[in-house]
């Protein structure tokens, strides 16, 4: 037992076996908290938090690590900005990271959700006291403000005041000068609703209602054009939370308000089955789709259903990596184009947090093994892999670069969006292991050691499983009395020769149309289901490169560990050379209990040890491998090495890279502009400044070297594109994009005079258009130092 588990057990020893569930509300059977019943028939209901508990497994290890983190967070520090903005004296110093920046307040919402769920599972009075304290503090802030509003970020009164007047200035993450303010409001509202759902705190519900009413007042004077302009800025799950508030209160005004947060630009094409996702910020979109899925449950709106179904299939089958995650630098690319999108910034963790929520809603209406094949894949290989199980810290991105390494959050000085969702991710591993069918059946969706206590049926079901190290799962039933019902067990996609037996008797059945084995009988006390799901090694290719493959064993993605020193980009990441395409011929088992494998003389230039991706931490790795036949490798080796050599040379010289139109890079580079426009073409985003406008940003330089700016443009423009390039207000070049006559990207270099960079670590670059011209479009900026 490692130290983190011992520490966690000391913290939560008196709690017994904890079971935690998710922030998201999935329909429960005969839920008395819900006044508005579902218009859409629900076929699979969620179990209550108190009904499922985890047994020993890697999932429980991760859960305990997260509980440790939640235990050391100080509510007064998360509440600091709320009290300050309400005119009250803060009781703690505000945390760092995004909490000390423009998104202050979002973490409190996630934290409130997490500890509310923790109380629902454990009934620990200390946790309840913490929830109640936060609610009392927020109510005090609401009373002091006298408007119903709750917020913690700077300049918020001006931001909302301008919006209420109908003044809407917006970009992808900016609304009237504020960083995605509706995103933060959503997190607070969701946290309040969770406190009500999971602890019964009625003050939390009242506070959420007051915040929703304030929302209505703020946007009441905006016409549809202004609302749609407002929605260009990320707004989180506002629509979903308002639908849930409608379901709880029965007040239709909240359903109507949810439609005010309907982004026509994105959602209408999706309803028509059009993939308009390339170039879009992934995590901005997914909560919009969750709202559609939830609203369809309540209202039966067919438009919402079309959106949710099409989006899920599009993301899962055309935009996702082997981990089940999606996005590169937070953005989606062209469908089925991922081969050149392996970087340090792949697969934002928030995306998968939200995709699992969406999957849960779709399953409630139409249960299928297909949905949980994805859920399982993403849970093992992205969510579980995004946490350092030793200390509970989380990844913003889970890098898939060949030879990459995970970067984890800091306890008190990060607080990004993915720390917020991570607080919840790792305390909810039991949320969807089981479901209750509308016909009284039991769904077994995931193979995770756990106990289900189904009180209404008088059933306690214990699941013991060897997965993923072994292939046997046992379900043992304890019943207060014999009962006839169906048990539905998912047949996983990764296993073909499955067998299922009851009390040792093999069942001659096949999966039904949903992909589940259905066993209907009169169940008795101590009945036992034995389920064997043979695992094997197999590969999954990149959609646009069949020779670049990831290796799986059962549900688990394997990673090749490459040491604690960054591998050489040319020789440090092996390629696989084999005439045999079957991965079982590539690997030897080193330790089955740890799922440790080793390549058998097929990796060049050296063989590699492979382990579950979720076990990698503080080491470099690769999950994708370039696979060659010996004949192909003989031809390709020189070309392959030369390409990697050139890329390494460029990376070694690179001081800074700036991609336009992306949230964090633009913040990191102090991007400002006037009369600018933004777009996406040729798979990349661009910025352009019109006449009398400008584009300005900071870049890193070497104070003792010759620095060169490399700008990326697209040729064959044939319009007024003449502009000056200034460094610290000194003109270093004049550019005319009409010089570039081919329809392709051009990488154009501009040397920075030594006197402008000497002694400096950064400079300010400005693109200023000539009269009757524009500056740009410019797609990216790279700064290199010359040798």
What role is predicted for each listed range?
Residues 1-24:
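Bacterial Sec-dependent N-terminal signal peptides
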Residues 24-29, 308, 372-381, 386-476, ...:
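C-terminal beta-rich recognition modules with glycine/proline-rich loops and embedded aromatic residues
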Residues 24-125, 129, 160-198, 235-253, ...:
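Aromatic (Trp/Tyr) and acidic
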Residues 142-143:
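Extended, charge-enriched "interface" segments that sit outside catalytic cores
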Residues 156-179, 205, 211-229:
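Asp-box/WD-like beta-propeller blade repeats and closely related beta-sheet repeat scaffolds
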Residues 486-492, 711-717:
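Aromatic-lined ligand-binding clefts that engage carbohydrates, nucleic acids, or primary amines
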Residues 506-526, 532-546, 679-700, 704-706, ...:
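Beta-strand-rich ligand-recognition modules
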């Amino acid at each position: 037992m490692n130290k983190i588990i011992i520490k966690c057990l000391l913290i939560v020893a008196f709690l017994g076996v904890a079971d935690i569930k998710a922030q998201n509300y999935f329909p429960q059977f005969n839920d008395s908290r819900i006044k508005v019943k579902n218009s859409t028939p629900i076929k699979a209901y969620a179990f209550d938090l108190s009904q499922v508990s985890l047994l020993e497994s890697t999932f429980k290890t991760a859960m305990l690590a997260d509980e440790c983190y939640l235990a050391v967070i100080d509510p007064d520090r998360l509440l600091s900005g709320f009290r300050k903005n309400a005119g009250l004296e803060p009781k703690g110093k505000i945390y760092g990271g995004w909490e000390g920046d423009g998104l202050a307040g979002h973490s409190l919402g996630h934290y409130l959700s997490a500890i509310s769920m923790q109380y629902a599972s454990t009934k620990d009075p200390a946790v309840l006291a913490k929830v109640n304290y936060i609610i009392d503090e927020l109510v005090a802030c609401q009373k002091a403000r006298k408007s119903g509003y709750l917020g913690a970020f700077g300049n918020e009164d001006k931001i909302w005041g301008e919006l209420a007047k109908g003044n809407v200035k917006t970009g992808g993450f900016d609304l009237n000068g504020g960083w995605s303010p509706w995103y933060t409001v959503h997190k607070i509202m969701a946290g309040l609703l969770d406190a009500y759902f999971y602890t019964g705190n009625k003050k939390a519900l009242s506070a959420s209602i007051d915040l929703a009413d304030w929302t209505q007042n703020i946007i009441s004077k905006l016409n549809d054009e202004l609302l749609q302009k407002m929605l260009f800025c990320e707004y989180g799950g506002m629509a979903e939370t308002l639908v849930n508030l409608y379901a709880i209160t029965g007040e239709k005004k909240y359903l109507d308000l949810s439609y005010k947060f309907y982004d026509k630009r994105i959602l209408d094409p999706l309803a028509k089955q059009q993939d308009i996702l390339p170039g879009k910020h992934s995590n901005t979109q997914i909560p919009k789709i969750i709202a559609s899925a939830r609203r369809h449950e309540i209202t039966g709106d067919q438009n919402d259903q079309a959106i949710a179904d099409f989006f899920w299939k599009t993301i899962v089958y055309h935009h996702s990596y082997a981990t089940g995650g999606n996005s590169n630098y937070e953005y989606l690319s062209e469908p089925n184009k991922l081969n050149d999108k392996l970087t340090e910034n792949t697969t934002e963790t928030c995306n998968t947090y939200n995709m699992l929520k969406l999957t849960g809603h779709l399953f409630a209406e139409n249960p299928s093994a297909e949905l949980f094949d994805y859920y399982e894949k993403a849970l093992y290989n992205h969510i579980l892999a995004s946490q350092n199980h030793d200390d509970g810290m989380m990844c913003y991105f889970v890098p898939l670069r060949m030879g990459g390494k995970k970067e984890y959050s800091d306890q008190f000085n990060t607080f990004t969006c993915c720390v917020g969702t991570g607080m919840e991710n790792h305390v909810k591993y039991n949320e969807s292991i089981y479901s209750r069918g509308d016909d009284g059946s039991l769904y077994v969706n995931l193979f995770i050691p756990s106990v289900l206590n189904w009180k209404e049926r008088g059933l306690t079901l214990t699941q013991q499983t060897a997965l993923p190290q072994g292939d046997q799962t046992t379900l043992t039933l304890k019943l207060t009395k014999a009962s006839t019902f169906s048990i539905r067990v998912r047949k996983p996609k990764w296993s073909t020769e499955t067998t299922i037996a009851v009390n040792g008797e093999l069942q001659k059945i096949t999966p039904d149309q949903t992909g589940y084995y259905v066993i209907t009988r009169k169940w008795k006390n101590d009945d036992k289901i034995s389920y064997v799901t043979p695992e094997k090694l197999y590969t999954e290719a990149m959609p646009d490169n069949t020779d670049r493959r990831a290796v799986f064993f059962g549900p688990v993605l394997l990673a090749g560990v490459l040491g604690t020193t960054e591998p050489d980009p040319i020789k440090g990441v092996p390629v696989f050379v084999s005439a045999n395409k079957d991965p079982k011929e590539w690997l030897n088992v080193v330790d089955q209990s740890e799922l440790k494998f080793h390549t058998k003389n097929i990796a060049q230039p050296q063989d590699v040890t492979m382990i579950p991706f979720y076990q990698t931490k503080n080491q470099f790795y690769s999950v994708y491998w370039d696979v060659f036949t010996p004949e192909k490798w003989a031809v390709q080796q020189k070309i392959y090495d030369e390409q990697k050599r050139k890329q390494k040379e460029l990376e070694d010289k690179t001081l800074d890279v700036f991609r336009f139109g992306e949230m964090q890079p633009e913040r990191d580079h102090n991007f400002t502009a006037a009369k600018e426009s933004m777009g996406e073409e040729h798979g990349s985003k661009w910025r352009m400044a019109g006449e009398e406008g400008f584009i300005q940003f900071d870049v890193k330089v070497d104070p003792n070297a010759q620095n060169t700016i490399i700008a990326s443009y697209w040729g064959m423009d044939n319009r007024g594109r003449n502009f000056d390039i200034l460094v610290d207000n000194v003109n270093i070049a004049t550019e005319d994009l009409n010089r570039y006559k081919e329809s392709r990207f051009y990488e154009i270099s501009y040397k920075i005079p030594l006197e402008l960079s000497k002694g400096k670590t950064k400079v300010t670059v400005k693109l200023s258009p000539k009269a009757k011209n524009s500056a740009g479009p410019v797609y990216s900026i790279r700064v290199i130092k010359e040798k």
